A protein has these predicted regions:
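Glycine/tyrosine- and acidic-biased, solvent-exposed loop/turn segments at the edges of beta-strands
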Residues: 1-92
Length: 92
């Protein structure tokens, strides 16, 4: 399943823009991989990759979360808010 905007760019502000039958999911905003409150890519094995504004920040956010004692696999609503505030403008 694919979600696109009127210009044909992958885009879904409410969930994954791509969902494959094998369980892979990809979040996009305006054609760029982007998700502020969770991983923007989850492969069929469950591995998670974090993207903000098209930039892969998986390594950076993993280190950042360890330093702040945030469990990226079990995010609370407060964790999601902190991530959005800290990382939402990355790459802009």
């Amino acid at each position: 399943m694919y979600h696109c905007d009127h210009g044909g760019l992958l885009h879904n502000p409410n969930g994954p823009a791509i969902i494959y039958p094998d369980g892979e999911q990809f979040w996009y905003i305006n054609g760029k991989r982007h998700r502020e409150n969770g991983p923007a890519a989850i492969n069929s094995a469950g591995r998670q990759f974090w993207f903000i504004n098209g930039y892969d920040i998986t390594d950076q956010i993993t280190e950042w979360a360890k330093y702040r004692d945030i469990d990226l696999d079990n995010l609370t609503e407060m964790d999601k808010m902190i991530i959005s505030l800290e990382w939402g403008n990355y790459g802009k």
